[in-house]
Amino acid sequence: MLKAFKAAILALLVGVAMLVTGVSAAQAEAPPSSDPDASLLQRQATSPEQLQEQVDLQLRLYPGGKQINDHEVAYDDGKFVITFAQPGRQLLASPDCPSGWFCFYDYANYGYPRGKLSDCGWQDLSAYGWHDRTSSVHNRTSTSVDYDNHTVGGHENDQYMFSNYSGGALNLSSTQTNKADHVYRYC
């Protein structure tokens, strides 16, 4: 009885903390997927059918998003958007982040899939399945963006990795690649 009471109190406190901080259940930290098909999200589709499989898998593994066209999924009313490479699309070699957004790419040289955000403040990329998936970045906002690595335990152990300044585009070093878990945009 006491155990159940403690669990109920803890759940209530977590719910209140999420309401106070504005963090939705979809934004609560999600563990990396153990689904064997998850690698499909990180490679280029070879057909329109496989592209739809990627979109469907993204939505199954990381619920709360909405397909907005044949190759994009949006979360939190469009605050975070994942763009999958369309079949036949070549590696970019130059960044293509839209104005007003900051983007992070799964591959070096701005290779898709691409995630993009425009909100200010702290964002947890794991809520969208984008933790440990950044190899290049492009910032088209008017402010800088910090990237952090969540190592172990609570967020007090997060490690600052680098800043991406307004207008900046860069390929990450081998010590930074596929480690970003959180971003902070200064506004």
Where are each of the predicted segments found?
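Secretory targeting and sorting signals
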Residues: 1-30
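Compact beta-sheet-dominated domain cores in extracellular/mature segments
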Residues: 29-187
